[in-house]
């Protein structure tokens, strides 16, 4: 507990006015294998060129997620792609410190709180370390994901992909590969219970609310994520295969990012930081709100199957316990559900895109059965 950033934040000299870029990798195959614009793999490539190690979140055989270090570019598929659940850190901080003390270059990626934790553990800055923090929405307990899988598929899932691009970058599709060889594609919030409650923060852990690490200055040398909303600013580019936002939070991060050659991008453009629209909340430290359905869901999921717990939590009777002073009523009628819902959004924390996500979640919830 001596180095837990929740008790002792590490010193932070990063800028509050960082340079921001919209980028797309030129390698079509790499882009296909990446959740957004492929920049994480391009940064990792520079680390491997220095005989360095790369740290990040990887799937385990039991479909839990853990942080690992890899030493070969051929192992990058383990670290690519979004994982919308908490990763097990184990002794990864100690592993990183050992590599650094041995003189090896390390590129380490994680949620902002994980980067702050690593920096607190190390106690000082290492010139041979580059940290990447992610534009993170929230990080639900891994137990929720395990329950969702077990209730929906038993032990038949061989692999799971949160951000399948079969229908495009912004399709929000999940791909579930069963041990029988069957592949199931679900269109995110509209067809999948887990995606629905992830994106409207019904699973948001209490410690993710008002996250102190998701603000400027950031704790990582570099911040990366999806550049949602960029098509409205620069409609002349093709974003169907994904685009990344890159924020260089200090000179070291900028210098490392600049090592990637222009030829490795089809798009690399410096843009105003305020252009970060759909992910802009992750720079403000105030958008990790708790869904008004969270307490009901936490209660129901203890005894009910996952999808049914979501349905019960979203039922109209659960809305009565929400303090009216926090609510902004929005009438929504769904022919599918067959009755009128009163949807409520957090007036100060919920933007229009998240309102649409909540509506999509509620209108399609009965498709899961």
What are these regions (language model features)?
Residues 14-41:
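Extended interfacial segments that mediate partner engagement and assembly in macromolecular machines
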Residues 64-94:
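Glycine-rich phosphate-binding "P-loop"
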Residues 35, 40-62:
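Low-complexity, highly charged intrinsically disordered N-terminal segments
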Residues 1-7, 38, 113, 204-211:
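Cysteine-centered iron-sulfur cluster-binding motifs in ferredoxin-type domains/subunits
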Residues 123-135:
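A short alpha->loop->secondary-structure connector
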Residues 50-53, 155-369:
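Long, compositionally biased charged/polar accessory segments in the mid-to-C-terminal portions
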Residues 1-16, 221-222:
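Iron-sulfur cluster-binding cysteine motifs and their immediate structural context
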Residues 66, 139-148:
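Short, charged, surface-exposed secondary-structure boundary motifs
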């Amino acid at each position: 507990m001596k180095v837990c950033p929740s008790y002792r934040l590490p010193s932070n000299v990063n800028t509050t006015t960082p340079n921001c870029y919209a980028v797309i990798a030129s390698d079509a195959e790499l882009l296909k294998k990446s959740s957004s614009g492929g920049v994480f793999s391009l940064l990792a490539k520079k680390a491997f060129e220095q005989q360095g190690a790369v740290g990040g979140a990887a799937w385990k055989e039991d479909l839990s997620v853990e942080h690992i270090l890899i030493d070969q570019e051929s192992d990058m598929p383990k670290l690519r792609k979004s994982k919308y659940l908490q990763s097990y850190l184990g002794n990864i901080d100690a592993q990183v410190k050992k590599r650094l003390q041995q003189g090896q270059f390390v590129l380490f990626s994680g949620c902002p709180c994980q980067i702050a934790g690593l920096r607190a553990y190390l106690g000082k800055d290492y010139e041979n370390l580059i940290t990447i923090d992610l534009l993170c929405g929230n990080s639900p307990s891994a137990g929720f994901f395990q329950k969702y899988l077990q209730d929906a598929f038993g032990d038949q899932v061989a692999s799971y992909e949160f951000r399948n691009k079969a229908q495009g970058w912004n399709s929000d599709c999940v791909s579930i590969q069963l041990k029988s060889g069957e592949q199931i594609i679900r269109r995110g919030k509209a067809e999948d219970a887990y995606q629905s409650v992830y994106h409207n923060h019904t699973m948001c852990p209490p410690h993710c609310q008002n996250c102190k690490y998701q603000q400027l200055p950031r704790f990582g040398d570099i911040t990366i994520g999806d550049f949602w909303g960029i098509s409205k600013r620069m409609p002349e580019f093709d974003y169907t295969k994904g685009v990344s936002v890159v924020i260089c939070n200090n000179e070291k991060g900028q210098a490392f990012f600049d090592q990637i050659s222009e030829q490795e991008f089809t798009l690399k453009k410096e843009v105003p930081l305020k252009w970060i629209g759909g992910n802009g909340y992750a720079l403000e430290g105030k958008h990790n709100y708790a869904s008004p359905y969270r307490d009901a869901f936490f209660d129901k999921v203890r005894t009910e199957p996952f999808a049914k717990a979501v349905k019960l939590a979203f039922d109209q009777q659960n809305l009565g316990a929400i303090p009216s002073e926090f609510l902004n009523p929005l009438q929504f009628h769904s022919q599918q559900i067959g009755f009128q819902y009163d949807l409520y959004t957090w007036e100060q924390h919920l933007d229009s895109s998240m309102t649409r996500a909540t509506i999509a979640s509620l209108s399609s919830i009965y498709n899961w059965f």
